[in-house]
Design a protein with these regions (language model features):
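Catalytic-core "active-site belt" of small-molecule-metabolizing enzymes
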Residues: 1-129
Length: 129
């Protein structure tokens, strides 16, 4: 499984973190398979960070290959959703941002992406709302 994540997409949280810049393009980052934490397994705080933050996320399972999909066809490319928790080593992230370095170490460490059980989209009356 590949995790493609969109960062900086919640304006209120961006303000809480002191970010005033409005992004016109999405901030994309990836998480490796080893980041996935499933089936009620415990999360252990890593020893390389003194500041682990967490955010609740909507997780969408992509079920078809595609590229540059028009928004009106997007619903054809996913089949299930769940809730997840994105853990971030915030102290490292600040340092990496200042140095303009990638986020992998602060976002993609082992067990940094807790995900629930996927629920088929048919179980929801209006998945867009």
């Amino acid at each position: 499984m590949k995790i493609i994540a969109v960062g900086m997409n919640y304006a209120q949280h961006n303000k809480e973190l002191g970010h005033t810049q409005v992004n016109t393009e999405p901030v994309i980052f990836m998480k490796p398979d080893s980041a996935i934490l499933k089936d009620g397994k415990p999360f252990f705080i890593p020893d390389f960070s003194n500041e682990i933050h967490y955010e609740t996320e909507l997780v969408v399972r992509i079920n078809r290959l595609g590229k540059n999909i028009a928004p009106r066809f997007a619903n054809r490319y996913y089949d299930a959703v769940t809730v997840g928790i994105d853990f971030t080593a915030r102290d490292l992230q600040r340092k990496f941002r200042e140095q303009r370095n990638p986020w992998e170490l602060c976002k993609g460490f082992d067990s940094s992406a807790a995900i629930g059980t996927f629920v088929p989209v048919e179980h929801y009356k209006d998945i867009q709302n």
